[in-house]
A protein has these predicted regions:
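Contiguous, well-folded functional domains in the mature portion of proteins
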Residues: 1-154
């Protein structure tokens, strides 16, 4: 289940070989959408969609509030927690933080979001979850730099 999403405004450096080697903390300074999931077994992992030059449009398939082409004044971020009851609507609109009672459940292969032109996705998980998913260091290394399509098995 999807637990929360964070839109983090940032820069739009190109995500190419030169930038990866020369721009310190490139993936941390570019604009990002961070989705935090919890598996049925309770393990958490994060999927980070990283914007880049010419790829400033990140949209989420399940929540229209997350559309990085809409630039709020002052470039404020946005955060939503799903599966929680909340009556803070006025405060939420002012702070950019929301809590939704309805949980979001994505099945394996479901579309989570899209880039208008494509960019980088970073998956963060602990070693135990990687082992359960049979993602060895060798298998992960073989995926570096390769394009991945929606629904494609890793």
């Amino acid at each position: 289940s999807l637990e929360e999403v964070h839109h983090i405004p940032g820069a739009f450096w190109p995500v190419n070989e030169w930038s990866v080697k020369n721009v310190d903390q490139l993936y941390a300074i570019n604009e990002r959408m961070v989705m935090v999931f919890r598996t049925a077994e309770g393990e958490r992992f994060a999927m980070v969609m990283v914007a880049a030059t010419n790829v400033g449009a990140i949209r989420l398939a399940f929540d229209a509030r997350f559309d990085s082409t809409k630039r709020p004044s002052g470039r404020k971020g946005l955060k939503v927690r799903y599966g929680r009851d909340s009556l803070r609507s006025d405060l939420e609109r002012a702070s950019g933080e929301y809590e939704d009672a309805d949980p979001i459940h994505l099945k394996k292969g479901d579309e989570a979001g899209l880039f208008a032109m494509g960019s980088s996705v970073v998956l963060l998980m602990d070693q135990n979850l990687a082992t359960k998913l049979q993602l060895s260091k060798e298998k992960l290394a073989s995926l570096i730099g390769r394009p991945v399509q929606v629904g494609q098995s890793l």
